[in-house]
Amino acid sequence: IDQVQQIIDLPYKQNARNGGQPVFNLAKDLFILSFAMMGMNSADFYNAPTAENEIITYQRTKTRTRREDKAEMKVRIEPEIKSLFEKYSDPSGEKVFIFHKWYRSSENFNKSINKGLDEIGKIIEVPDLNYYYARHTMATLAANKAGIDIARVDEMLNHSDSTLKLARVYIERDYSVLWEANR
């Protein structure tokens, strides 16, 4: 929780030399958005086609071709992140977010985010900070701090494995619960 708060509290950097936004700022914002939007992947921010009534509906890029339900997900835009949502909305309405106009591919978009997160990681002393840290942290805090059932966390991550094996990979084990149970 402390590291997420540190990222939220980091001041923005001034505009880049070319008048664009520094990747530091983009990385900070996308980390916050991913964390607050159930670990939404950068490729899904890049490709998300629609938002209606403050709900983004998308098919998870990574797994849509492998699942019968096309890995469809609906994520609500919570009031705490509405300003970030609006900041990056595509004014043309072609897609939910404008990133597809700023970057040639979702891979380039992800590289920029991770470049900014590397810089942020050095500041907050989290070596190798990357975009997936937001997804993992969301899952860990949901299960270990908010007490959300692991099956629900698995759904939040848009996993379809009934054994919850993937959720267990994402969620850092909280030994304090075991120690307390052992007392």
Where are these regions (language model features)?
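Short, polar N-cap/turn motifs at the start of nucleic acid-interacting alpha helices
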Residues: 50-57, 127-128, 147-169
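C-terminal catalytic core of tyrosine-transesterase DNA break-rejoin enzymes
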Residues: 32, 36, 40-43, 112, ...
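Short, contiguous acidic/charged loop-to-helix segments that flank catalytic cores in large enzymes
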Residues: 16-21, 61-74, 100-109, 126-130, ...
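Conserved tyrosine-mediated DNA breakage-rejoining catalytic core shared by Y-recombinases
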Residues: 37, 46-86
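Short, leucine-enriched amphipathic alpha-helices that occur as contiguous helical runs
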Residues: 4, 24-28, 110, 114, ...
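Basic, Lys/Arg- and aromatic-enriched nucleic-acid-binding interface segment
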Residues: 1-42, 46
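Active-site/catalytic core of tyrosine-dependent DNA strand-transfer enzymes
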Residues: 1-4, 78-126
